[in-house]
A protein has these predicted regions:
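Membrane translocator/pore-forming domains, dominated by Gram-negative outer-membrane beta-barrels
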Residues: 1-285
């Protein structure tokens, strides 16, 4: 994301990076209650991210790498008659970070948490086109241990932020059942192959307004010299306009590929601004 005013004035510095993770989840309960489908389960995830951070003048200052492991639980509720749904997610994460710049390394561990409540109501525009208004509330926090490198000490403290997202999702709703292919026959496995045009595919766009508030978290640093301590208070409070778009295709009965890309534009405060993209591979068993 872009720099919004400079870190010395409390803004988040400009950065760019990438991440990858593996997630394994399983349903623990599936039932029907009062006309609703209820599903509850747990998941675990492990991932790695690498982020390049820039100074106020645009020069590269260093790289932050994070190895993270997460455990979480989810609850999904669907009203069978109307299609109204709600997702509740709670997650805890353990972080192991390394910051590197100018032959100076800094290592720190920490803990993060996240809670999310999301709801939506789908409306059929045509037989295979769905418009779904959505509303989501997210509360997340991070606590990092204090650390020290060759330049001095750093005290991170505790940080947290809350987000409200309001928008809608417009997309196709084709049957994702992996039917009988006609393009050729896989004689080794005795199953039909599928050409690209035969694959079940859904596409969607999702414009949203995201409001970030109650963003807090101070960071102080200094040396053994008296009076050298400085405190920074990066803020993400503000409003962003966000646009996401994606495609998903079922390439096997239990295998789905997806791609997603988006852009967020800050319209007030120090909210996030920048591009994002991701590719996913979803396997069920």
């Amino acid at each position: 994301h872009d720099n919004n005013g400079g870190i010395a004035r409390g803004a988040t510095p400009e950065s760019s990076g990438s991440y990858g993770f593996v997630r394994l989840e399983g349903d623990l309960m599936r039932t029907e209650v009062a006309g609703m489908s209820v599903t509850a389960g747990v998941y675990g995830a492990a991932g790695h991210s690498s982020v390049d951070v820039k100074d106020d003048d645009g020069s590269r200052t260093g790289t932050v790498r994070d190895d993270a492991g997460s455990l979480g639980g989810y609850l999904n509720l669907i009203h069978n008659a109307s299609g109204l749904w709600a997702d509740i997610v709670a997650q805890g994460t353990r972080h192991s970070m390394k910051a590197s710049s100018d032959n100076n390394d800094f290592r720190v561990r920490g803990r993060g948490w996240l809670g999310s409540l999301e709801t939506g109501l789908p409306f059929s525009i045509t037989d295979n086109l769905i418009l779904e208004p959505q509303l989501q509330y997210t509360w997340q926090g991070l606590s990092l241990d204090d650390g020290q490198d060759n330049a001095g000490y750093v005290k991170f403290g505790h940080g947290s932020a809350q987000h409200v997202r309001a928008g809608f999702r417009l997309g196709s709703h084709n049957d994702m059942t992996f039917g009988e292919g006609t393009s050729s026959r896989d004689t080794l496995r005795g199953r039909a192959k599928h050409s690209v045009r035969e694959l079940p595919v859904n596409g969607w766009v999702q414009p949203s307004v995201i409001r970030t508030f109650s963003s807090r978290g101070d960071m102080s640093m200094g040396t053994a010299t008296a009076g050298s301590n400085m405190t920074f208070s990066p803020s993400r409070n503000g409003t962003s306009l966000d646009l996401q778009a994606g495609l998903e295709a079922r390439v096997r009965e239990n295998l789905t590929l997806g791609v997603q890309a988006g852009y967020a534009h800050s319209v007030s405060g120090s909210s996030a601004e920048g591009y994002n993209g991701q590719a996913t591979l979803n396997m069920t068993f």
